[in-house]
Amino acid sequence: MEEMYVYKNQQKLRWGYTTGTCGTAASMAAALMLFRQKRVSHVKVSTPKGIDLDLEIEETRFTKEQAVCAVRKDSGDDPDVTNGIAVYSRVSFRNDKQETEGYIWENGGLCLRLTAGEGVGTVTKPGLACEVGKPAINPVPREMIFTHVEKVCKQYGFQGSLNIEIFIPQGAEISKKTFNPRMGIKGGISLLGTSGMVEPMSEKALTDTIRLELHQKHIAGLKSVILTPGNYGESFLRDELDVNLDYAVKCSNYIGESLDMAVQENIEEVLLVGHGGKLIKLAAGVMNTHSSVADGRMETLAAWGGACGAGEKLIREILESVTVDQGLKLLETVPGLREKVMEQVVRRAWEHMALRAGESMKTECILFTNERGILGMSPGARDMLKRILAQDMTKLD
């Protein structure tokens, strides 16, 4: 494949291609081998992004009845746990038209059936792009596979029935490192992608996952959900507040966008629970809390410290602090000052949330640190948490 690059934050990063593109290339190559009865070393795949890829084919084998081969995933410079895995396709002749737990493509006298084998997940929850009980092969990869195999069939004048089986031997193990089990994909990974390409360090991939989780919560009947930025928040919810994490959606640094998406998915209430190191930024109106976007943590603590009575020396010491915990420790040198400051920080964070969400969705927030526990909460946070936990979870199972 000819390498493609994009520049992000002054870094030159290499594009990759999706599991869906791997499945497409492997299926096309297997179909070619079945008809030619010869090994295939490369195939050209057209992606929805308009980029043609020349991909290497591995582990080829064939008989007169079937052909099998693999294409290895290359995620480029994107930190993807599926990078390097082999995606296999087995294409075989079929004479029957029995239903399978897969997908069917018919055009004239041609019938293609796409099924999943080892390591490809099965959808177990509604709200995904695939029906419950079907293989987790999303619509765009499905169409790519069908159109590329159909092209081969037309090339050889084939009219009849073929079965296309995608399998990924490492899929079940790798899926444990992904969001798949949480989103309702069991037993393996998905064939994903809308463009056929992997954009390095793509924010869209993360926000798409957040939107999908919010959508699943909504269609399962939840009107109120918890947002939390990361692992600290999930641990605090589970260990300190005894919250089942099925009520929560991890929003990473995308607090503003997550609130927008919750509104769009008709969620009625959102409780944001997060570590002070993240959510103190929200008190300054920072809606993307990634360190590369903005900071302002010490400035926020120092400003409210001054507003609540801290002297000039203490303000300067707070500004020179490296961590939020250091800043809080300095505030604690004055009795009652930390509590006053955090009351204002929580109020401002809550106000910024409410402003972003608008009138159609209620918002509350809870700030904590691992060392100090809850630092503060907005007025309705406790009651909102009770309402969230009172919701029926059976449709999420």
Give residue spans per PLM region.
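A structural signal for small-residue-enriched, beta-sheet-centric alpha/beta enzyme cores
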Residues: E2, Y7, R14, G20, ...
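Short, surface-exposed secondary-structure junctions/capping segments
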Residues: G133, L396-D397
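Short, amphipathic C-terminal "tail helix"
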Residues: K362-T394
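Short, low-complexity, polar/charged sequence segments that are solvent-exposed and flexible
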Residues: F62-E65, Y88-R90, G108, V132-P135, ...
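Generic N-terminal targeting/processing segments that precede catalytic cores or assembly contacts
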Residues: M1-K177, P181-M183
